């Protein structure tokens, strides 16, 4: 079963067709030598811990590989952490005065987050949506459903204390996803608010 029998608790290297125990430095050195000069690809799943993802990134870079941030085509810049993590915490929704949703239907994509948005709305927060109309369980103002509407919203934006801008994955997986992300970040900055990527 791997937990009680035959559990790997030390690294092994193959020598003359047989496995023998080795130190971590020897095992990693053997693996690095075997990978040297070959094309290497690493893929991290959505549920992998950040430490494992970071270790894989370092290994791929040390072997001369390049790092792609997403496999779904999302235009998230790997070099700008705030662009893919955001600057807002979920708890910021509890005190938000204005929430702007861009290219997302949180009722489908993140129901618990949608409940937090509803709670903020019940406490007086204004909600604006850039995207198709949907039943989100709270009232909102539609700014339009296209990129021109997003640009117009950014151009007209003024500082509003307690603003949280939320961008959905659907908005940044399209060909102009980088521009959408940049506009969303500019909107948050211009409104003096925080930014969150679903």
Residue ranges and their predicted role:
Residues 166-198:
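A glycine-rich, hydrophobic/aromatic-adjacent loop/helix-cap motif
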């Amino acid at each position: 079963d791997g937990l009680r029998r035959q559990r790997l608790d030390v690294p092994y290297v193959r020598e003359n067709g047989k496995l023998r125990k080795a130190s971590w430095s020897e095992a990693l050195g053997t693996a690095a030598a075997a990978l040297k000069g070959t094309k290497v690809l690493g893929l991290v799943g959505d549920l992998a811990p950040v430490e494992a993802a970071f270790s894989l990134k370092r290994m791929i870079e040390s072997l001369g590989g390049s790092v792609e941030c997403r496999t779904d085509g999302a235009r998230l810049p790997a070099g700008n952490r705030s662009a893919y993590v955001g600057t807002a915490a979920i708890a910021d929704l509890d005190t938000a005065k204005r929430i702007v949703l861009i290219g997302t239907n949180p009722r489908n994509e993140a129901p618990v987050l949608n409940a937090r948005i509803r709670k903020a709305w019940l406490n007086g927060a204004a909600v604006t949506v850039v995207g198709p109309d949907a039943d989100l369980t709270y009232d909102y103002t539609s700014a339009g459903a296209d990129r021109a509407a997003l640009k117009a919203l950014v151009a007209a934006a003024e500082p509003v204390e307690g603003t949280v801008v939320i961008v959905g994955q659907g908005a940044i997986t399209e060909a102009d996803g980088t521009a959408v992300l940049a506009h969303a970040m500019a909107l948050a900055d211009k409104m003096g608010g925080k930014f969150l990527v679903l």
